[in-house]
Amino acid sequence: ISAQENMPIILSDSENGTEVADNFIDSKDIAKSYVIGGTYSISNSVERSLPNATRIAGSSRSETNAKIIEEFYKDTDIKNIYVTKDGTKNKNDLIDSLAVGVLAAKNSSPIVLAGNKLDTTQKDVLNTKIIDKVTQIGGLGNENVVEDILDIQEETKYTVETIDELNAAIKRADANDIIKFKP
């Protein structure tokens, strides 16, 4: 998202925060900051030192990923989703996410970080999207995630006759479903 929105990525140090980048931040007159990750990764003091900071964090890497998709990909229609390993088994697996980042930015498409299955929060946010294409990046290890995303995209048709049935169908339906109201 940083390349897509022309936002620099500033890395922070657990002891010195963004000290090495403070001159850059001041010189670029940055008006808005996003802190990605919880307080274990980036302290509250670092967050407070940044201009107009908003923290995007979950209880896990997968939940943080879901919140990033929710925050920066508001449209229902998504051209492509790139699925990469989340680095929990091997931190070197995260290189796939970095490698596909430029392509994802060019296509305005999110990256889904996942192990061998989607997190519930990832499923919830992807359930609100209509995804044209799912692309697995890197080697084996997250094929189940690709299948899960494709399953989420299946269309369900509801035919309802009463307002109560309509309300129930609306609660169950996702972005790919069709509800026919025949009173």
Where do the model's predicted regions map?
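Extracellular glycan-binding segments that recognize GlcNAc-based cell-wall polysaccharides
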Residues: 1-156
